[in-house]
Amino acid sequence: TPRVFSSAASDVYKRQDYKQLETVKIIFIHVPAAFLAINVYLMMTVASIVWLIRRQYVSALAAKSSAMIGLIMTIATIITGSLWGSSTWGTYWVWDPRLTSFAVLLCFYVGYIILWSAIKPLERAANVTSLFCILGSVFALLSRYIVFFIDQGLHQGPTLSLDEEKNIDDSYYFPLILALVGFSSLFVYLLLVRTTTELNKLKLKLMG
């Protein structure tokens, strides 16, 4: 409800972290953006596999429509992470596993979009980009799970955890959940609009 959102926003606005002060509020953009950067690519991978198996245009076009959104979220993750890192680590960038995997993920997003623009006709473009997307899914998975298996460097562990001792404070936890829901809802809306537009373009092309 609006009251829940306004209450959460008010609490976040007033509260400061005793170590990071105001900079901790970057978390409400950084974490949802990172969540989408990874999961949008994984969704693209699933859609690409569906295209290769079932040859359904909607799956290929949904993957295509997701790519720019995922790219923007990846860039937002890297920028906000750099700003946050400058405050907490004293540097904008370090080549630790999490950051490096996101840099590679960014390259795969850019490469995917370029391939869609460069290759014709649609079927061939869908085939090539689907294979490319599946290859890049390895780095999307690394971006998500690498902190569980190897030394995470300067980057912190998972922000949200089922272990209450490792979880963030409740005053940030619930507003962060709301931010995740908001970002995810925006993605779904944009995906539906962009995919519908792509399908309409395809219909007009086939009719013409």
Where do the PLM segments sit?
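Non-cytosolic membrane-interface motifs at loop->transmembrane helix junctions
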Residues: L21-F28, T88-F102, A125-V128
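Membrane-interface helix-loop-helix modules in multi-pass inner-membrane proteins
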Residues: I72-I114
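Membrane-interface transmembrane-helix boundary segments in multi-pass integral membrane proteins
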Residues: F148-S185, L206-G208
